[in-house]
Amino acid sequence: MKTVIFCTNLPSPYRVDFFNEFGKYCELTVLYERHSSAERNVAWKGTGAENFKEIYLELKPVGVDRSKGSALKNYVKEHLADVLIFTNYVSPATMEAIVWCRLHGRKYYIEYDGGFNKKDPFVKGLLKRFLLKGAVGHLTTADEHIKYLKSLGIDKSKIFKYPFTSISEMDIINANVLTSKGRSYFKQKVGISENKMILTVGRFSYENGYGKGYDILMRLAECMDPSIGICIVGDSPTKEFVDWKKEKGLEHVHFVGFKGKADLADYYAAADLFTILSRGDVWGLVVNEAMTYGLPIISSDLCIAGTELVKDGENGYVVDIDDFETIKQRFLELISDDDKRVSFGQNSFRKISEYTFRQMTENHVSTLLGGVENI
């Protein structure tokens, strides 16, 4: 069985679940730079290592989710593996390890959650080219990010696309069981009195709510019938948004604090429409989760999961975050058309059934290990 060292920043729940699945096919060691992120709720963590070895490195935290120190480089230097993978290449500790690999001829892969096709400042672009072009392969999630990698001079033969996810096949089964009870049942359970419900999930701490486009949702709430509830699940709202709701009398806007996976499932099952109006998400796994519950999606064009998983007129709409009139039109169109929401939701479910941990693992086994037959 091949040995794999996987270097990442945090034990996020979806990563831990993937590692436990991937670890069935290799001798997997996961190196974590940190125990947690400065911007995440302390309850946001994985369940633990079952099929892999986990090591928390002694590194100094930098910013939200990066680290510095030589522990990662030293571990890589002292331990050989058939496959070496880095994820958080913008972290100083990971940069140091990659530079060592380049200088000493150690082969490595880089994996990405996603990303935008953007033009970097000159010096930053040079640094990225040095770090990334030394990799023997790049695993990424989206066509948009593939364009970016190619713009850095990465050969297309070294780029591999994989289905990024936070859901298992059991999650899909459980979602089916929940939604079979009907959305009205779950509206009552979570305390939503409105006839219909628009749901979004994300942190107000991201640019004070503007990063997730909550200002757009508040403007929409002002235009919508109060029988349509807008539910924002995440952390505590900022004072600005609390005051906005009070001053405009938006009683149909509901601010809900952090919810764990089990409680959040009730909100997905209660919703009629899911939206993510982010001003910058390199992926956005809540889109995957919402599609599991058969929800139509309205996503901004700055959420990579939306641009990758949502097809206009099939399972939702991708909208220009700066075009409020079109955004309003799409919301009013979908929330008022029951048949279209059902059709779009069914298409969402079919699409996301291709994005499970099993399929993500099979992709990695094929790309990194040469397929199951070579294990």
Locations of regions flagged by a protein language model:
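Conserved donor-binding/catalytic core segment of Leloir-type glycosyltransferases
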Residues: I5, K181, I192-K212, M218-A221
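A short, histidine- and acid-enriched strand-loop-helix "catalytic/donor-clamping" loop
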Residues: P92, R106-K124, G134-G137, T141, ...
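Donor nucleotide-sugar binding/catalytic pocket of nucleotide-sugar-dependent glycosyltransferases
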Residues: K133-Y185, I192
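Nucleotide-activated donor-binding/catalytic signature segment of Leloir-type glycosyltransferases, i.e.
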Residues: F241-A262
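Short alpha-helical donor nucleotide-sugar binding micro-motif in glycosyltransferases
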Residues: F258-K259, D266-A271
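Aromatic "clamp/platform" in nucleotide-sugar-dependent glycosyltransferases that forms part
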Residues: R279
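Short hydrophobic beta-strand element within catalytic cores of glycosyltransferases
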Residues: P296-S300
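Conserved acidic donor-binding segment of nucleotide-sugar-dependent glycosyltransferases
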Residues: K311-G313, Y317-F324, L332-D339
